[in-house]
Regions:
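Stable alpha-helical elements in mature extracytoplasmic
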Residues: 36, 40, 57, 132, ...
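Compact, glycine-rich, soluble single-domain proteins
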Residues: 45, 49-52, 56-98, 102
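Beta-strand/loop substructures that line and gate deep hydrophobic ligand-binding cavities in soluble
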Residues: 99-126
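Soluble non-cytosolic domains of exported or imported proteins
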Residues: 30-35, 52, 127-134
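Bacterial N-terminal signal peptides
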Residues: 5-16
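C-terminal partner/receptor-binding element of secreted or periplasmic proteins
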Residues: 118-151
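Terminal, regulation- and interaction-focused segments at domain boundaries
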Residues: 19-48, 145-149
Length: 151
């Protein structure tokens, strides 16, 4: 009995992990991680949004004598979009401001990854067809496309 419950639990975790991964949108970048995040930051600021934080995970790892391939996260947002989401479901603050991760994989390819706003809308009981979700989705696509453009 316990054995069946254990395997059912593992299956549930695997399914949840797969669903969470399916809700991530990923693009590749021809630029380094640092340049990709620089370009993203410039695009965010040009769009009139606010950059709240830039986290260099590899630098953090180096501070504790560990090595991590280049990995940086940019946290940004616009209260005109985030506030209505939080008014509909205050727990949306766990996923806001928006975050985009750029990292270099073992083969040297730079990836840009972010969560699809529709997935966190569902997680926080927000209406999936809300205008702010559509606007966040469009903004993330536009901003990450600018950051990963070959130009």
């Amino acid at each position: 009995m316990i054995r069946h419950a254990f395997f059912a639990g593992l299956l549930g975790l695997a399914t949840a992990s797969s669903a969470w991964a399916a809700d991530m949108i990923e693009k590749t970048s021809p630029h380094s991680v640092a340049e990709t995040i620089d370009r993203l930051e410039a695009a965010v600021e040009a769009a009139g949004a606010t950059v709240f934080a830039r986290v260099d995970h590899a630098a953090g790892a180096a501070n504790v004598d560990m090595e991590l391939r280049p990995t940086q996260m940019l946290m940004f947002g616009n209260p005109k979009l985030g506030t209505p989401a939080m008014l509909d479901g205050q727990t949306a603050g766990l996923d806001l401001p928006l975050r985009v991760l750029a990292y270099e994989n073992g083969e040297g390819t730079v990836h840009v990854t972010y969560h699809d706003p529709a997935s966190f809308a569902a997680a926080h009981g927000l209406p999936g067809d809300a205008k702010y979700i559509q606007m966040m989705t469009g903004a993330l696509d536009k901003l990450t496309t600018a950051a990963t453009a070959a130009e």
